[in-house]
Regions:
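An N-terminal-biased, well-structured beta-alpha scaffold segment characteristic
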Residues: 1-8, 14, 107, 127-129
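Rossmann-like adenosine-cofactor binding region
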Residues: 87-176
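Phosphate-binding beta-alpha-beta segment of Rossmann-like dinucleotide-binding domains, i.e.
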Residues: 10-58, 70-77
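Glycine-rich Rossmann-fold phosphate-binding loop(s) that bind the pyrophosphate
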Residues: 64-65
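Conserved beta-strand positions in the Rossmann-like core of class I SAM-dependent methyltransferases
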Residues: 9, 83, 147
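Structural/interface elements that position substrates and couple domains in central-metabolism enzymes
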Residues: 17, 81-83, 91
Length: 176
């Protein structure tokens, strides 16, 4: 494939482990787990961190390869709406996700979960323009590759309240 200019990628680890990790990050951000744990460490047990529940939300999965598909399959048990976008449409997943165009996914999703490879076409895939299309208060999850997200745009969106949270397993080369 490389000889004829076709890029080939493979993630040698279990799609299920990454999918579970992505969903765990969604739940942690939605339920404010880190601030809650910090309060508990200081022996502050007052209420105030109820958060949001997945059954009331729409999750948009960007990239429906093995990992993105597995995220969608695992999310089915949570009762949320699942939207999906893939560079190459996946008609075989029509029973699992509602296939939509990227702009629609960004505008309708309460959570956007990235599952793309890193290549020149996906560098800073989530930038100022993409974030502007996202729902106010949305959450961004990136367990794929750091360069998919423009760090400066993400920080600005979090500080302004445009995004309510982010779960990041990977970062672009710059420190956050």
């Amino acid at each position: 494939a490389n000889a004829v200019g076709i890029a080939v990628g493979n993630a040698p680890y279990s799609p299920a482990s990454v999918a579970d990790y992505a969903i765990m990050m969604m739940l942690m951000v939605l339920r404010h787990i880190k601030p809650m744990l910090l309060r508990y460490a200081g022996q502050d047990y007052t209420a105030g961190y109820l958060g949001r529940e997945l059954p009331n939300l729409t999750v948009g999965i960007v990239g429906l390869g093995r990992i993105g598909e597995t995220v969608a399959r695992h999310l089915q048990g949570f009762g949320c709406r699942i939207l999906g976008w893939n560079r190459t449409p996946r008609a075989d997943l029509s029973d699992l996700v509602e296939a939509v165009e990227l702009d629609e996914l960004l505008s309708r999703s309460d959570i956007v979960s990235l599952h793309l490879t890193a290549c020149p076409e996906t560098e800073h895939f989530i930038d100022v323009a993409a974030i502007e299309k996202m729902k106010d208060g949305a959450v961004l999850i990136n367990t794929a590759r750091g360069p998919l997200v423009n760090n400066s745009a993400l920080i600005d969106a979090l500080e302004s309240g445009k995004l309510s949270g982010a779960g990041l397993d990977v970062f672009d080369g710059d420190r956050l």
